[in-house]
């Protein structure tokens, strides 16, 4: 086991503090509309240029192990804020730095770190409550566009596209971000339920020009197992053919004799049909087939449920207004399922979302929910170069997260103003002693820091701006983009309340933990051993004197 180096008291906090500052100083140059970019070297490919706080934080590893501990703790603040709120990572980092910097001075002066932590916790609790009263719900598409614009670094195109996407697919809808082939950033909305499986044979195509199969008012058969024999399917096929309606077969697979017979019947014009593989795998496939059945008003043919393919009738099939199948995707538009059945299914999926502990499962459940109730929107991000594409995609994802947070918990004045507005409630906090009061004062000073930094990045004196904003009321604040003092809500400079809240809570949590640290332990760097000198001469060749 490698030997350890142990630092105590002032020395430990000093090293941690240096690490915190190195990371925070790299991150905070990105804050606000006039914030700068950071360029990050990559071991392969072109460098990344970003204005996203968490991307910068994640790249930082310091050589000194104790300094690195401090940096990693603050990195945790940025990551956690990004995971929960999706934005506000730079604000959270700046708050953590300010809380720790002020706290370290007081601990060095002999104050009790545990009492300071209690004071910090009381102050944050009070501020979070007040933030709730300051927040207003998002009223319209315009406000959503403003939030998206601010989070995307004042890019109105991105803000408007996100607002349009949210208007089309609703709160429950899924919005994904993809890389576009061209330079334009566009929005594509898929109506109805879409899943990523296409036709099993190109012979099913009805439009050879577009290479798609489009069926109007089709019956939809959902089968859990493979279909390889024709005899099981014959009864239901005959019933559908008599009614002269198209048929969509969604099964684990359709192969051999069954697929060949379907293709022949399609080519002869006996039956308009298309066969598609079921989406997903394992239990998720069963659940998705059930979703399709509920949406279309059909029944899943499953031996687990005691339903066999040879015994089903047309009454067990679902229907929809239209089904479009291409090489890679199937879209079911306007399924004929009963609204109460769909609502019950949605309620069940929501309960599963609340219960699951896996982020992956939650994401997949939300996708299923969106397909049932909302829809799916795809934002195709276009750019001239790969470097610009990465940077733009980051901004779109940030903006998307911020708008979701705003819809969830409402909005507050942006640009660091919300923290200044709520700071007055700190006068009502009742600390138990002077050390707790010092903790409250740390927060009072720290929450001014985001506004100071935004002003500083825009080329203004932070202290003057803070005083002027403090003298104002409600939404009055500093618009760093224009350099004006105005009503920020009217000017469209707004932040999601959730982002503002999470940034403060996470920053206070990690910074106060760092403050209560008295000892730091890290592995000693191994002393580099000098390489041994190569042996001289050609030893071992004696005894050759007898050669002439």
UniProtKB/Swiss-Prot annotation:
Subcellular location: Cytoplasm
Gene3D superfamilies registered for this protein in UniProt: GroEL (3.50.7.10), GroEL-like equatorial domain (1.10.560.10), TCP-1-like chaperonin intermediate domain (3.30.260.10)
GO cellular component, one term: cytoplasm
Entry EC no(s): 5.6.1.7
An annotated GO BP: protein refolding
Protein keywords: ATP-binding, Chaperone, Cytoplasm, Isomerase, Nucleotide-binding
Major location category of this protein: cytoplasm
GO function term, MF aspect, one: ATP-dependent protein folding chaperone
UniProt xrefs under SUPFAM superfamilies: GroEL apical domain-like, GroEL equatorial domain-like, GroEL-intermediate domain like
Keyword Lyase set for record: no
Domain of life: Bacteria
Binding site for ATP: 30-33, 51, 87-91, 415, 479-481, 495
Catalytic activity, as annotated: ATP + H2O + a folded polypeptide = ADP + phosphate + an unfolded polypeptide
Enzyme type, top EC level: isomerase
UniProt similarity note: Belongs to the chaperonin (HSP60) family.
Subunit structure: Forms a cylinder of 14 subunits composed of two heptameric rings stacked back-to-back. Interacts with the co-chaperonin GroES.
NCBIfam families referenced in this protein's UniProt entry, alphabetically: GroEL, PRK00013.1, PRK12849.1, PRK12850.1, PRK12851.1
Function of the molecule: Together with its co-chaperonin GroES, plays an essential role in assisting protein folding. The GroEL-GroES system forms a nano-cage that allows encapsulation of the non-native substrate proteins and provides a physical environment optimized to promote and accelerate protein folding.
HAMAP family in the record: CH60 (MF_00600)
Protein name: Chaperonin GroEL
Organism for this UniProt entry: Nitratidesulfovibrio vulgaris (strain DSM 19637 / Miyazaki F)
Name of the coding gene: groEL
């Amino acid at each position: 086991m490698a030997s350890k180096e142990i630092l105590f008291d002032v020395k430990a906090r000093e090293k941690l503090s240096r690490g915190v500052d190195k990371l925070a100083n790299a991150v905070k140059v990105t804050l606000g509309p006039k914030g700068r970019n950071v360029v990050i070297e990559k071991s392969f490919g072109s460098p990344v240029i970003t204005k996203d706080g968490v991307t910068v934080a994640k790249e930082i590893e310091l050589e000194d192990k104790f300094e690195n501990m401090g940096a990693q703790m603050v990195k945790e603040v940025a990551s956690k804020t990004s995971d929960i709120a999706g934005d506000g990572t730079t604000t959270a980092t700046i708050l953590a730095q300010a809380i720790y910097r002020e706290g370290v001075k007081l601990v060095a002066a002999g104050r009790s770190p545990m009492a300071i932590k209690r004071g910090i916790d009381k102050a944050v609790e009070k501020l979070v409550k007040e933030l709730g009263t300051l927040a207003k719900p998002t009223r319209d598409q315009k406000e959503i566009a403003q939030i998206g614009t601010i989070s995307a670094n004042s890019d109105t195109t991105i803000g408007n596209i996100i607002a349009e996407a949210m208007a089309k697919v609703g709160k429950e809808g899924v919005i994904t971000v993809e890389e576009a082939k061209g330079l334009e950033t566009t929005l594509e909305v898929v109506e109805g339920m879409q899943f990523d499986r296409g036709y099993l044979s190109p012979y099913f195509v009805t439009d050879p020009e577009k290479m798609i199969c489009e069926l109007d008012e089709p019956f939809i058969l959902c089968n859990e197992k493979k279909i390889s024999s024709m005899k099981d399917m014959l009864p239901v096929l005959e019933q559908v053919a008599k009614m002269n309606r198209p048929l969509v077969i969604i099964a684990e697979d359709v192969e051999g004799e069954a697929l060949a017979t379907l293709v022949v019947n399609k080519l002869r014009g006996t039956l308009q049909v298309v066969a598609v593989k079921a989406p997903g795998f394992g239990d998720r496939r069963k659940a998705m087939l059930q979703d399709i059945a509920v949406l279309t008003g059909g029944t899943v043919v499953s031996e687990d449920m005691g339903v066999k393919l040879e015994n089903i009738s047309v009454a067990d099939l679902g229907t929809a207004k239209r089904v479009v199948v291409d090489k890679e995707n199937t879209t079911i538009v306007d399924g004929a399922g009963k609204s109460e059945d769909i609502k019950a299914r949605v309620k069940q999926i929501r309960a599963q979302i609340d219960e699951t502990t896996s982020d992956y499962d939650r994401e997949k459940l939300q996708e299923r929910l969106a397909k049932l109730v909302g829809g799916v929107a795809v934002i195709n991000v276009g750019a001239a170069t790969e470097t610009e594409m990465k940077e733009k995609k980051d901004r779109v994802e940030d903006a998307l997260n911020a708008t979701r947070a705003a819809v969830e918990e409402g909005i507050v004045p942006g640009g660091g103003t919300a923290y200044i507005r709520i700071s007055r409630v700190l006068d009502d906090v009742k600390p138990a002693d002077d050390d707790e009061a010092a903790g409250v004062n740390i927060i009072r000073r720290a929450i001014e820091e985001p506004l100071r930094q935004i002003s500083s990045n825009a080329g203004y004196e932070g202290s003057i701006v803070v005083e002027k904003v403090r003298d104002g009321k409600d939404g009055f604040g500093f618009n760093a983009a224009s350099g004006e003092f105005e009503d920020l809500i009217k000017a469209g400079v707004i932040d999601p309340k959730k982002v503002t809240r999470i940034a403060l809570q996470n920053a206070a949590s990690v910074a106060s933990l760092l403050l209560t640290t008295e000892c730091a332990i890290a592995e000693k760097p191994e002393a580099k051993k000098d390489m041994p000198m190569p042996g001289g001469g050609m030893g071992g060749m004696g005894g050759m004197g007898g050669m002439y």
